[in-house]
Structures are given as structure tokens and as C-alpha cells.
Regions:
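Conserved beta-strand hairpin/beta-sheet module of binuclear metal-dependent hydrolase folds
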Residues: 1-45, 120-132
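Short, flexible loop segments at the rims of nucleotide/cofactor-binding pockets, characterized by
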Residues: 3-8, 26-29, 50-53, 107-110, ...
Length: 204
């Protein structure tokens, strides 16, 4: 599976296309803004799906335009944010499910913390994992309550750390990175004592 990316929006957000090289079939992930750039990202492919890693506004700003242009199913986690936004999902993404894209597959990981409906998309048989705002090279995704921060810590321990060091993480903002490059920092972060009421921005 090939991963294409482009930055979109006034607060740069990474949109992605997952492309099956055997069939040319593609899926657009996180249509945050700038439909013309998103169409360029899909050039030469046959889009078959729109996928959301989560439903924060910076990741779905061009969703309605792209739905109107592409006429393909919308996949997302059926969490509270999707319900609050009244998104009409065509299919739900659940932990450990798989989704076919041409002859390729992605495995779904529920990775809550930054928000309840956050998922990550791992290419089966490959190294790429689209992590949304689960984590970045410099720290975990921002959290909005102490409970969310504790959820983020649990996600790092139970979901992210079991991934191999070779996992190539593609985040919602900023550069991609190998998990092995940041694993020692994550482990140190998890080993530290954090105030019970802490939440917000954090660095490893």
C-alpha cells in the first residue's frame, strides 16, 4: 500500500491517500481542507472510500465537499463526536477490524485520548500506520480533560508500544517518524509521575 500525503488548511494538517499499487484503488483519509489539493492527492487513482481518523474540525473541514465530489462511502468510529456532528456514516470503524482497499488491507486500532473516537490505520503486511492525533514525534496528542489524559496514557501503553519499532507513524500534523525513534521517550514519559489533574499539551 502506498501512502501519499499533503498539508492542507490554515493550521497545517496532513491529509493522506492510501493507494493500492496493484489496482489503483485509493482511500482519502482526513479531508481537512482545500478540496483542490485533495483531488490532486488522488490523481490517477480510483477513490473508493473516505476515512476519518477522528472528527475534529481541522480533520473534516472539506468532508462535505469531498463527499459530493467523490460519491464514496464514509468510514469513521461511531463515537460521540460523530454523533454530535450528525455525520451520516456509511460504515463504522471498530478496534481490530480490517478494511479492504483494492488488494490491500488496513487494520483499525482504537486509540482514544485526544478524543474518544480516535482511530489509527495500520497497513496490513506493511510498516505504515496513520495515527491521526494519537501521538507525534514530540509528544502525545493534546487532551481536553484529566480523564482524557489518563486514557491517552493507557492507549500508549496497551496499543502503541506493542507496535514494532519499524512502524512508520504518519500523524495528523508534522513529520512522520519511526516508532523505534521515540519508543525510549514514550517509555520514560509513561514512567514519570503526572499530576492527577493534568491535561492539555505535553511533551515526551
Amino acid at each position: 500500500m502506498l501512502v501519499r500525503t499533503c498539508e492542507v488548511g490554515p493550521w497545517p494538517m496532513n491529509a493522506y491517500a492510501l493507494v493500492c499499487p496493484q489496482t489503483g484503488v485509493s482511500a482519502l483519509v482526513d479531508p481537512g481542507a482545500d478540496p483542490e489539493h485533495l483531488l490532486a492527492l488522488l490523481q490517477g487513482t480510483q477513490p473508493v472510500a473516505l476515512i476519518l481518523t477522528h472528527t475534529h474540525r481541522d480533520h473534516i473541514g472539506a468532508l462535505e465537499e469531498m463527499r459530493a465530489l467523490l460519491h464514496v462511502p464514509l468510514y469513521a468510529h461511531p463515537g460521540p463526536h460523530a454523533n454530535d456532528l450528525h455525520l451520516e456514516l456509511d460504515a463504522h470503524l471498530h478496534h481490530d477490524a480490517t478494511l479492504n482497499i483494492g488488494e490491500g488491507q488496513v487494520r483499525i486500532y482504537a486509540t482514544p485520548g485526544h478524543c474518544a473516537d480516535q482511530v489509527s490505520l495500520a497497513v496490513v503486511g506493511g510498516e505504515a500506520i496513520l495515527v491521526g492525533d494519537t501521538l507525534f514525534a514530540g509528544g502525545p496528542g493534546r487532551t481536553w480533560s484529566a480523564r482524557d489524559f489518563q486514557t491517552s496514557l493507557a492507549t500508549l501503553r496497551t496499543v502503541v508500544l506493542p507496535w514494532p519499532d519499524t512502524a512508520h507513524c504518519y500523524p495528523g500534523h508534522g513529520p512522520s517518524f519511526r516508532l523505534g525513534e521515540v519508543r525510549p521517550l514514550i517509555e520514560q514519559f509513561l514512567a514519570r509521575q503526572h499530576p492527577a489533574d493534568f491535561y492539555g499539551h505535553a511533551e515526551w
